[in-house]
Amino acid sequence: MLFRSPGDKQHTLASIVKVVSACDAASCDLVAKVYELVVTAGVHKASSIKVAEAAKIIENTQRDLNIALMNELSIIFDKMNINTYEVLEAAGTKWNFLRFQPGLVGGHCIGVDPYYLTHKANKLGYDAQVILAGRAINDGMAGYVAKKILQYIIQNNGNVKDAKVLVMGATFKENVSDIRNSKVADVVKELKSYSLNVHITDPHAESEALKHEYGFELTPVLSNDYDAVIITVPHSDYKKLDDAYFASITKPHALIADLKGMYRGAISSRNYWSL
């Protein structure tokens, strides 16, 4: 099983233990020997192909569920006027707290693999309620974010059709060009359904690929009068941006919606919100 996260330079082919299996012991030994030539972390022989495949599926399902919990907590804490990241920092002082963060869940693994398991469970007569509940929460985050932006604009501007929103980030995760199953596309779609004028920028994505896959293109020249800016993907390129930059591209009453909390404590001239 050869799986690694796109853009991850720390967990490389050689440094990740490989789970292997085959139709018989001799074939499994052969596959293991091939991997052992390049994988310094070691090889784990699973007892069957089913076990190996199930291991990969639950790895991504577990991550999906943990992020879903963070997303649900973020929604609850927002209603309570509590900063989610402050709560996570406090909880993170405990050795047994798992460090996950809220955010959009896209890509071709985490948001997809759980459905293989729930589909198989359904065929066997079992309804995987927890897994599907997590999927529903994560898939609903794009709509949740778009609605928060709409509500803010209505309260502070009123004229939705004249409002402009900048979405920063279009790929499914940071520092990659991969746009497969990007939930940013869902955010853009939801925003446009409210008749908002949406501009999109991304230092890694290709405009033609976005147009082909989702029907929208990157904005070549940014405006200086956005009513809201949504930082959807925490690309490293964005880390150098500061309060002055966001002030230069937005109206005085604008909202900076920082989904991954990149600019916590750094935005003072505009209204700030994060998951």
Predicted ranges, named:
Residues 1-275:
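Structural/interface elements that position substrates and couple domains in central-metabolism enzymes
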